[in-house]
Amino acid sequence: MSRKNFLHFPIITNGNMALSSITSSVTNIQRLDNIGIQFNWSGAPVGDFAVQISADYAQDTEGNVTNAGNWTPITLSPSPATSSGSPIYIDMFQLSAPWLRVVYTRTSGSGTLQATIVGKMI
């Protein structure tokens, strides 16, 4: 039986939700079928989360960005907002784009954000 790809690591650690926005690190999701992102926060932030994908972002073998790429938000229904309460978990299936990141956009309030991504090949 062949080895299946799997990932699990933080993409935002101690994000300051009093800032106008927080952008996660970029994650390579090639060869992964299912992706999940969990957001946990403390405090009383008000804002929205977006998942963005890119087909033209690029890194060299050392992880240096060689093309910042163009980022497109995925339509999520309903759009995840802090008003839903912490934690929020987003499950995504069969994404075709090779790169993913998340963005929190503040409306008001403040808090501290943690976000973790998981992914697996089926």
What are the language-model segments listed below?
Residues 53-59, 119-121:
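Residue-level signal for short segments within beta-strands and strand-turn junctions
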Residues 1-16, 118-122:
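Short, intrinsically disordered N-terminal pre-domain segments
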Residues 32-39, 93-112:
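Noncatalytic modules at the cell exterior or secretory-pathway interfaces
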Residues 74:
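Non-catalytic beta/alpha edge segments that cap or flank active sites
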